[in-house]
Amino acid sequence: MSEQKIRIRLKAFDHRLIDRSASEIVETAKRTGAQVRGPIPLPTKIERYTILVSPHADKDARDQYETRTHKRVLDIVDPNDKTVDALMKLELAAGVDVQIKLT
């Protein structure tokens, strides 16, 4: 039988928030006896927006904004029931998007 694995993908706009959440997940998984791979940083997605400031003329007057989406991947190898229960009870920050896939 192949080993079971939980893959957790984290997304957030603030890198400090995502790193703190990843360390909480790693700490919780290690405390229950599971082996953890990661957190692996994925490329940061940068979206830039250019907006004209002037309502009529002046194409030279523009503001530029950007959003950075930081991503991390964690693999929990061979988790047990205690690991799954502890991860379900874990409360992370509100600005972190968590996707969990069981393979």
UniProtKB/Swiss-Prot annotation:
Taxonomic superkingdom: Bacteria
Key word Repeat present: no
Biological process terms in GO annotation: translation
GO cellular component: ribonucleoprotein complex; ribosome
Keyword Ribosomal protein: yes
Pfam (any one): Ribosomal_S10
Keywords associated with the record: Ribonucleoprotein, Ribosomal protein
Gene Ontology MF, one: structural constituent of ribosome
PANTHER family reported in the protein's UniProt record: 30S RIBOSOMAL PROTEIN S10 FAMILY MEMBER
Task of the protein: Involved in the binding of tRNA to the ribosomes.
Assigned protein family: Belongs to the universal ribosomal protein uS10 family.
Quaternary structure annotation from Swiss-Prot or TrEMBL: Part of the 30S ribosomal subunit.
Name used for this protein in its record: Small ribosomal subunit protein uS10
Higher taxonomy: Bacteria, Pseudomonadati, Pseudomonadota, Gammaproteobacteria, Lysobacterales
The gene coding this protein: rpsJ
